[in-house]
């Protein structure tokens, strides 16, 4: 019995060490692209949805470091103000410890309330943006909801499709004029590898006939890609580019609706620590598409780990993309 117990302990320890090795010395994706010119984004205004936590917060932190003026569009203003305060303190401390203490090119950080589950909130937010912001250089559609129980938005849409696709669809369309007048400008859309498991069912976009939270998330992420490709077509010649990305598997609170049995949680935590990206790692492609001169003029492409990737045929179906666009215009009230 003692031998068996010792063997089990050694096996567990060996497994943990192997996972740790994979975490730190394995073939990890290009982990960080830091070290860019701190003034690269100086004078540029960037709007990031869902910037108070996870990928959005990490994206905001790096773009601030690069000198951007960052607007955090967040549903919970109190949490966003708290996150903004933490970011300011962290960046101030980093500047004080830098090669020239007290000298910082860190950009400005602004918090604005935006609830993508409410078209009324989206319209109010955009009206405020158009009244108060003279320019918008980068829009990052980052916010999202993941595999939640069935619920509806304020306007009666299935929550994942409503927030992940329709809310951002309206937001982007209402800000297009400002983006065009600020050109060259960029739109960055955060999708997911899980788009592969989704389909666009035009007969039940609201998932009222049946609801599978995993499938509906994948559908919304496929919609993000189709939206990006159709928008890129419509923006040809405007000097406004739009690209879409997947961040990989990232340790964020996006999966808060997923139930993990108590006995499995320790193993899940170990696996996520070993194999999942940190938010900073996951944000690198968003940062790259928002700031890098390498993608100047590039539009309608799909990226992962800061490089272009191929899409499945269903994500490149132009007729489906146009039909989705037309229906989305009606759903959000851009067309009657």
Curated annotation (Swiss-Prot):
It is an enzyme of class 1 (oxidoreductase). NADP(+) binds at residues 50-56. Pfam families: adh_short. This is Retinol dehydrogenase 14. One of its GO terms (biological process) is osteoblast differentiation. CDD domains: retinol-DH_like_SDR_c. Widely expressed. Its EC number is 1.1.1.300. Belongs to the short-chain dehydrogenases/reductases (SDR) family. Retinol dehydrogenase with a clear preference for NADP. Displays high activity towards 9-cis, 11-cis and all-trans-retinol. Shows a very weak activity towards 13-cis-retinol. Has no activity towards steroid. GO terms for cellular component: cytosol; endoplasmic reticulum; endoplasmic reticulum membrane; lysosomal membrane; membrane; nucleoplasm; nucleus. One of its GO terms (molecular function) is 11-cis-retinol dehydrogenase activity. Keywords: Lipid metabolism, NADP, Oxidoreductase, Phosphoprotein. Shows clear specificity for the pro-S hydrogen on C4 of NADPH and the pro-R hydrogen on C15 of retinols. Pathway: Cofactor metabolism; retinol metabolism. The keyword Phosphoprotein applies. Substrate binds at residue 192. It catalyses: all-trans-retinol + NADP(+) = all-trans-retinal + NADPH + H(+); 9-cis-retinol + NADP(+) = 9-cis-retinal + NADPH + H(+); 11-cis-retinol + NADP(+) = 11-cis-retinal + NADPH + H(+). The modification Phosphothreonine is found at residue 5.
